[in-house]
Each structure stands twice: as C-alpha cells, then as structure tokens.
Amino acid sequence: SVAITFDDAYLSVAENALPELTARGLHSTIFVPARLLGRQPNWTMEEGSPDSEEIIMPAEMIASLPSPLVSLGSHTCTHPRLSRIDPAQAREEIAASRSTLEELTAQDIRLLAFPYGDHNSLVVELCKEAGYDIVFSTIPYGVDTLGSEFVRGRVKVDPFDSRLEFYLKYNGAYAWIPYASFIKRKLRL
C-alpha cells in the first residue's frame, strides 16, 4: 500500500500538492510542527536545499485543512531530535503538539512523524503514553512492512526522482538499508 505524507506542513504543499492530490481523489497526511505555524523552519538544512525558503503554513490554514482527503498528524511542537533531548522535554513535545493541533482543528490527532525520523525506545513509549495510534519513522520500508503495528517506516520520494528511481522506491529496492545500518552499528561494538 501507499501513503502520501508531507512533513513540516510547508505552505508550498497547500499551494501545489494538495490541489493536485484533491483533483485526483488521493488522500494525504500532513505532519505539522505545532508551535512553528506561519514561520520559517528553525531547523538546520543542507546548503542550497529548496526547503530553506519555505514557510510553515499559518494556523488558519492548518485549521481549514482537515477533510475526507487531508489528514493531519503531529510533527512535535518545535521539530527537535527527540532521542537527544531530556525525556521530560520529549514528553512535552510529543503530548503538547497533539493537544495543540486538536484544539486548533477540532480533530482527533492520532498520528505522529518523528522529526528527522529520530527515535529510540523511550520516545516510542512516550508516544504510546500520549495516545498516538501510529508513529512514522524515515526508515525506508513500506508503510506496512516494518514489522510493527505502532512504528511504521516511510520511503522518501522527491520531486526530482526519475521514473526509475520512483519505481525502485515503490517496489522496496531500498528495504535493505536498515539491515545494513544495523550490521554496521554492531560491527563498531
């Protein structure tokens, strides 16, 4: 199966992607950093990244988005690397983002995407504690093949991917990467 997701709730997603997806009747989920609405991202990006000029959608736009074809999920409050911050701060980022978005949209927020895909077992437990149904990483697995009902993987697709690259990603050609990373980590011990 395929899930269309967008991290960071950039204004360009609302302006460009959503009209095209809606015209085609395709559902998508936007993961929102709840306390950065209407601002430029405060996180570090690669030099020359097209995202460096982006603006996060303002609150009014986020509030108007939920529909049968557009769902919202949490992307924490301020987009930190959750495994690298104090557990109390991580708990606040995870829980407050959900409550902030629920208050703004009057929708039940049940999904979270980890900023940078960064998580550990404590972060996963904090997400369960906060009441999320499913959380997403950037591990390059299909959405239904990570082996966990709670933590799901995703494969990043970029606008500049060739048709071949898209085909390979769609068909799981990069599913070996987590295994290689695991082995590499074990060999360092």
Residue ranges, per PLM feature:
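Metal-dependent polysaccharide deacetylase catalytic core of the NodB/CE4 family, i.e.
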Residues: 1-2, 11, 22-120, 149-152
